[in-house]
Amino acid sequence: MYYSLVRKALFRLDPERAHDFTFRQLKRLSHSPFQFLIQQSLPAKPVSCMGLSFKNPLGLAAGLDKNGDCIDALGAMGFGFIEVGTVTPRAQVGNDKPRLFRLVEAEGLINRMGFNNLGVDNLIENVKQSQYGGVLGINIGKNKDTPVEQGKDDYLICMEKVYPYAGYIAINISSPNTPGLRTLQYGEALDDLLSAIKNKQLELQGKYQKYVPVAVKIAPDLTHEELIQVADSLVRHHIDGVIATNTTLDKSLVSGLDHCNEAGGLSGRPVQSKSTQIIRQLNEELKGALPIIGVGGIDSLTAAREKMDAGASLIQVYSGFIYHGPALIKSIINHI
């Protein structure tokens, strides 16, 4: 009930200003006498996935808490896991503003943020200070000014730094807002990247005497043939999981709505069926070889169940959380 009032006020602000304001307040509430305002006591619905134990199958997708500023506050709301990032080796400002747009009628968002973040070292300091007891995923990417041909180096730098602190590491090669990034999803470039990542993972396993699983985040805009090739590469390189999907570039889904022609990736309800279709196809190709984390347009218990019925072992929310607030977490976890 209270979130509908909060949302009404926040939606009067520019989307990015609303996000920044909300995060400042969440940070203040965390570990304060007023944390009860965001705390939700939810039943345990344990899931084992990628060799990890999750208290429930619902997580927060990357992109909302890029710098790990509000891990504990978000954790208090009942998520089974939280994915922070995307983070890059060096801090970067991202693309020019405005770069985030609401499509309220469709409960969608278009963003062209461009991996704005304070860098991997800042994220690690925030993770160290966190008291969150759930599984923490850390999503990593490449800096905009790193040539795509050398992008692999950025992922390896980030892996080296986050490995001791991550429950799992997510490799983001599917954001549409970093020029050339999505080319890493194809053919030789993908094989080269996955080979380097697997080798680094095994090296770090030896160094730290613990195995941190790696999941690759893919786009919803892959053709069926491209998806078959991606699935084959993931299996051949013994990747631990796949996150499906990132945002779509297909704006036909929101044709005629305000902001529908803005450049960037579309998320929220409009991408729901597209991402579910990718999950279903992936599930058919992978045949259980590795688990799928389903994300894209989950805004209700029904949408969450659709993702899991399509083959997802875990699910994540982002836009749906912005539109529906903590009640969405409660509804899904209570009844999933």
Curated annotation (Swiss-Prot):
UniProt binding sites for substrate: K66, N111, R112, M113, G114, F115, N172, N177, N246, T247
Pathway the protein takes part in: Pyrimidine metabolism; UMP biosynthesis via de novo pathway; orotate from (S)-dihydroorotate (quinone route): step 1/1
Any Pfam family the entry gives: DHO_dh
One of the GO BP terms on file: 'de novo' UMP biosynthetic process
Active site: S175
Residues annotated as transmembrane: none
Statement: the UniProt record of this protein carries the keyword Transport: no
Free-text remark on how the cofactor is bound: Binds 1 FMN per subunit.
A cellular-component GO term for this protein: cytoplasm
EC number: 1.3.5.2
PROSITE patterns: DHODEHASE_1, DHODEHASE_2
Subcellular location: Cell membrane
SUPFAM superfamilies in UniProt: FMN-linked oxidoreductases
Bilayer topology term: Peripheral membrane protein
Reaction it catalyzes: (S)-dihydroorotate + a quinone = orotate + a quinol
Assembly with partners or alone: Monomer.
Family: Belongs to the dihydroorotate dehydrogenase family. Type 2 subfamily.
Alphabetized NCBIfam families for the sequence: PRK05286.1-1, PRK05286.1-2, PRK05286.1-4, PRK05286.2-5, pyrD_sub2
Name assigned to this protein: Dihydroorotate dehydrogenase (quinone)
Organism: Proteus mirabilis (strain HI4320)
Highest classification ranks of the organism: Bacteria, Pseudomonadati, Pseudomonadota, Gammaproteobacteria, Enterobacterales
